[in-house]
Curated annotation (Swiss-Prot):
It comes from Helicobacter pylori (strain ATCC 700392 / 26695) (Campylobacter pylori). This is Bifunctional protein FolD. Belongs to the tetrahydrofolate dehydrogenase/cyclohydrolase family. GO terms for molecular function: methenyltetrahydrofolate cyclohydrolase activity; methylenetetrahydrofolate dehydrogenase (NADP+) activity. One of its GO terms (biological process) is tetrahydrofolate interconversion. Pathway: One-carbon metabolism; tetrahydrofolate interconversion.
Length: 290
C-alpha cells in the first residue's frame, strides 16, 4: 500500500480513459470513411517477453476497434526477407503503422531495419528522421514510452519547466528521447548511464527522477530528496513471480511526492501512446489520399 503522503501516478486509469476516447474516435472514423486504422506488428523469434508485449498491443488494438496484422517470423529469418516484408507494409495502403518488436536476433542489423520503415508509418518513433524532428522540436511520431511518461506527468499537473530532472538509462528507446522531451519542456536534464560514477549525486538533487534500466531496487530512498517525483520505467520479472520496477517502491514511496507503480504505471501509457500514434498516422494518410 502506498504511503498516505505520496500520490500514485496511475497510468492504468489514465490509459483506460484515453482508450475510451480512441474507441469513440475510431467508431466515428469508421462510420464516415468505412475504414479503420491498422497496425502491422512484426515479431521475430520466440522471446517470451516480446511475445507478451506483442499480445498486450494486440489486445489493446481489439479494445479500441483498431485492426492489426501480426507477422510471426522464425528467428533465423534473413535481413533481406525482413526488409522485403517491411517494404510491402510501407506500400500497403491498408496499413497505417508498422512496428518491429525489439529486440531482434543478433544477426539482424536493428538500425538498418528501423531505418527501412516509412517515417510516416513509424508509430514507434524510432526512425532517425522522427528522432531528428524530436530534437529540433518539429512535429513527429514520439517514441511511445517517453510520450507516455510526459502524458502521465501532464495529467497530474506536474511542473517540468525549470525543474531538475535525472534520467537513469541512456537507451535510444527511452532515455535519450525522454531527455529531449524533458529538455524541450524546459527542464535541466542529467542523463546517467553505465559509466556514471555516482548516480546518487544526480538523483539527490533532482525534482524528477526517471529510471528504466532493468535493475530491481536500483533507486533507494536515500538517493532521493523528499517530495521528488519518481517515474519507474523498469520492468523486471522476479523468480517468485512478481513484476517489479527499478525502484525500491516500499521505501521510496515514504519520501517521494509522486511515484509510478509497477505494474500499472508507465506500461499501460506506452501501449496507449502507440495506439494514438497509429491513429494519427491513419488520419495523416487519409488527408493525403493514401
Amino acid at each position: 500500500m502506498p504511503n498516505r503522503g505520496v500520490v500514485l501516478l496511475d497510468g492504468q486509469a489514465l490509459a483506460d480513459n484515453i482508450e475510451k476516447d480512441l474507441k469513440h474516435k475510431i467508431q466515428i472514423i469508421t462510420a464516415q470513411t468505412h475504414k479503420r486504422p491498422k497496425l502491422a506488428v512484426i515479431l521475430v523469434g520466440k522471446d517470451p517477453a516480446s511475445i507478451t508485449y506483442v499480445n498486450m498491443k494486440i489486445k489493446a488494438c481489439e479494445r479500441v476497434g483498431m485492426d492489426f496484422d501480426l507477422k510471426t517470423l522464425q528467428e533465423n529469418i534473413t535481413e533481406a526477407k525482413l526488409l522485403s516484408l517491411i517494404k510491402d507494409y510501407n506500400t500497403d495502403q491498408n496499413i497505417s503503422g508498422v512496428l518491429v518488436q525489439l529486440p531482434l536476433p543478433r544477426h539482424i542489423d536493428t538500425k538498418m531495419i528501423l531505418e527501412a520503415i516509412d517515417p510516416n508509418k513509424d508509430v514507434d518513433g524510432f526512425h532517425p528522421l522522427n528522432i531528428g524532428k524530436l530534437c529540433t522540436q518539429k512535429e513527429s511520431f514520439l517514441p511511445a514510452t517517453p510520450m507516455g511518461v510526459m502524458r502521465l506527468l501532464e495529467h497530474y499537473h506536474i511542473e517540468i519547466k525549470g525543474k531538475d530532472v535525472a534520467i537513469i538509462g541512456a537507451s535510444n528507446i527511452i532515455g535519450k528521447p525522454l531527455s529531449m522531451l524533458m529538455l524541450n519542456a524546459g527542464a535541466s536534464v542529467s542523463v546517467c548511464h553505465i559509466l556514471t560514477k555516482d548516480i546518487s549525486f544526480y538523483t539527490q538533487n533532482a525534482d524528477i527522477v526517471c529510471v528504466g534500466v532493468g535493475k530491481p531496487d536500483l533507486i533507494k530512498a536515500s538517493m532521493l530528496k523528499k517530495g521528488a517525483v519518481v517515474v519507474d520505467i523498469g520492468i523486471n520479472h522476479l523468480n517468485d513471480g512478481r513484476i517489479v520496477g527499478d525502484v525500491d517502491f516500499n521505501n521510496v514511496q515514504k519520501v517521494a511526492g509522486f511515484i509510478t507503480p509497477v505494474p500499472k504505471g508507465v506500461g499501460p501509457m506506452t501501449i496507449v501512446s502507440l495506439l494514438e500514434n497509429t491513429l494519427i498516422a491513419f488520419e495523416k494518410q487519409q488527408r493525403k489520399g493514401f
